[in-house]
Amino acid sequence: MIKVLFFAQVRELVGTDATEVAADFPTVEALRQHMAAQSDRWALALEDGKLLAAVNQTLVSFDHPLTDGDEVAFFPPVTGG
């Protein structure tokens, strides 16, 4: 299983802070695409190009490989003022 965490606006849009999915996705991008297909709100929350990802608490690119037991976090880019 892969544990998926959502933070900030992503969490608000998907309506949960975490979920678990089968370890059937070779990359972070494959997982993102699968989850974005669940509904319009999920698609908006996980929109390509407006999201960062971390695997096991390390910032990664979306072509990063996934394995069983990984923890993936999706969150919006941090902005400051």
UniProtKB/Swiss-Prot annotation:
The modification Glycyl adenylate is found at G81. GO terms for cellular component: cytosol; molybdopterin adenylyltransferase complex; molybdopterin synthase complex. Pathway: Cofactor biosynthesis; molybdopterin biosynthesis. There is a cross-link at G81 (Glycyl lysine isopeptide (Gly-Lys) (interchain with K-119 in MoaE)). The modification 1-thioglycine is found at G81. Transmembrane segments: none annotated. Induction: By anaerobiosis, repressed by the molybdenum cofactor. Keywords: Isopeptide bond, Molybdenum cofactor biosynthesis, Nucleotide-binding, Phosphoprotein. C-terminal thiocarboxylation occurs in 2 steps, it is first acyl-adenylated (-COAMP) by MoeB, then thiocarboxylated (-COSH) by IscS. The cross-link is not seen in all structures of the MoaE-MoaD complex. Heterotetramer of 2 MoaD subunits and 2 MoaE subunits. Forms a stable heterotetrameric complex of 2 MoaD and 2 MoeB during adenylation of MoaD by MoeB. During catalysis MoaD shuttles between the two heterotetrameric complexes. Belongs to the MoaD family. This is Molybdopterin synthase sulfur carrier subunit. It comes from Escherichia coli (strain K12). The lineage of its organism: Bacteria, Pseudomonadati, Pseudomonadota, Gammaproteobacteria, Enterobacterales.
